Amino acid sequence: MPRLQCLTMATSLILLLQALSLVSSTILSRADRITRLPGQPRVGFQQYSGYVTIDEKKQRALFYYLAEAETKPISKPLVLWLNGGPGCSSLGVGAFSENGPFRPKGSILVRNQHSWNQEANMLYLETPVGVGFSYANESSSYEGVNDKITAKDNLVFLQKWFLKFPQYLNRSLFITGESYAGHYVPQLAQLMIQYNKKHNLFNLKGIAIGNPVMEFATDFNSRAEYFWSHGLISDPTYKLFTSSCNYSRFLSEYHRGSVSSMCTKVLSQVGIETSRFIDKYDVTLDVCIPSVLSQSKVVSPQPQQVGETVDVCLEDETVNYLNRRDVQKALHARLVGTRKWTVCSDVLDYEVLDVEVPTINIVGSLVKAGVPVFVYSGDQDSVIPLTGSRTLVKRLAEELGLRTTVPYRVWFAGQQVGGWTQVYGNTLAFATVRGAAHEVPFSQPARALVLFKAFLGGRPLPEEF
């Protein structure tokens, strides 16, 4: 057989295999396509949701929700969003309370006018197994889960998810999240970089983490100064909270099941003065008194601007919506090993001591590898206050020898100050979001969208109206 004919046949075979692979992937993704969510207004973009099995032997599967970009999805990046906890849902919190296209309102969904899928294809992942609709056939899979397991599972998820959606393979990929995602996001990004050394699968373009847990002592001990500076605790209590028992010491003792009498005394006094009617995740706002959830998990923002109203019990509505059978059917979701979908898992046994393991060093390794890192903080959050995050970013910049390229200054959203920002080198940025809570996109959606656009574009935040 002539050489040219052999080459032609080989090329044809390769093209045929590629075509078959594409057809197979199309069938897989088509099965996950959402026709329409109950109560949803008409939209022009596609939605998908379903499962990716990350462990066939133990039947461990992670649940995802993809909201493609409102316009030109083919030309826009893919953004993975992870909520923290550990053990809280990126579907219920991220997609349906923060930056997704819809928010529940009674029996219907209303459009989020500041949804992040205006700028990107948004992928929300319920992780680890045991969170939300993600499940395992054996309850033992929910025990002893830790950061290492979660990072590996998230990597496997992405590898297999790309088999369903190969059209996203070469797309610019960003990883974002908040709170304990200060562990999830850097750890996943680190594994992706390591994997790319052999396989070059991920087109990672940057990470963004909001009010993130990055270094146990610095993050949590900044709470005392925040409480005091905002008038939530008295001078004597502030002194006790910084000298007799700081918050990282209390948490460390609490996680080990042996809280000292001194820490019990100090935290009791702090609790009395701050009161249980203050949302620690947003100290300026009201709480949802009849909430079916723990108060500490409810984000209750005030109106962002004149004429805008916000439901302070939004998480209640999300819980009710996602527990509807018709909604679960539309999402291709099912409950395994639990009777009810919850915002934060009540079956997951996570290794709480992992919170004490710093990830700021991993963030530094990402910066050195050329991955842009954006750390942002809602300035009304007392749980992971901006002061701790700002200190950590500044310290990291000094350790890496990065010069300041954007001096500390205000940035604008519309005709108002959106917050303050500083940039080091070309890869490390910090910003505050004025008036925002722990969950920035929920409490300040317009400002969060401005920040998100700048992050995706690799640009400094606006310094003019």
From Swiss-Prot:
Keywords: Carboxypeptidase, Disulfide bond, Glycoprotein, Hydrolase, Protease, Secreted, Signal. It is found in: Secreted. Gene3D superfamilies: 3.40.50.11320, 6.10.250.940, alpha/beta hydrolase (3.40.50.1820). The keyword Hydrolase applies. InterPro entries: AB_hydrolase_fold, Peptidase_S10, Ser_caboxypep_ser_AS. The active site is at 179, 381, 438. It comes from the Eukaryota. GO terms for molecular function: serine-type carboxypeptidase activity. Ubiquitous. Its EC number is 3.4.16.-. One of its GO terms (cellular component) is extracellular region. Disulfide bonds join 88-344, 245-263, 288-313. Glycans are attached at residues 137, 170, 246. It is an enzyme of class 3 (hydrolase). Residues 1-25 form the signal peptide. GO terms for biological process: proteolysis. Belongs to the peptidase S10 family. Probable carboxypeptidase. This is Serine carboxypeptidase-like 46. It comes from Arabidopsis thaliana (Mouse-ear cress).
